[in-house]
Amino acid sequence: MFYRVRAQLRQDTAAELRRKLTDGTIQSQKPDGQEIVDSMNRAVVTKSGEIEWSEVCYCDTPLGHERATVYDHHFGALTTQLVDGYQEHQGRPFMAYLDEICARRQ
């Protein structure tokens, strides 16, 4: 099933999330690591500051495993909406936004 996901980034864990997305930690997670990485690469930051992306998931509870292992640690106010497939979202690329946050903290 495909979902549109909206959430607020937890700024205090942004650097950790970026590191795990780029060093293979999340990618190696089974069964959904690659989909999480791909989803974060599709994600955007909307004008309101919300992070928005689309993702495929086959858990009984939408994004159940993804939330337990990654998302609930790094995002708050996460909501899902069933959609027909991957969606295009308007906004700034999320990964570039993470890079900016990390650069400001160095």
Can you annotate each of these PLM segments?
Residues G24-Q29, H73-L82:
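A common structural junction motif
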Residues M1-A68, H89-Q106:
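Short S/T/G/P-rich N-terminal loop/turn motif that feeds into the first structured element of a domain
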Residues I36, G76-Q90:
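Conserved short beta-strand edge segments in small beta-sheet-based binding/regulatory domains
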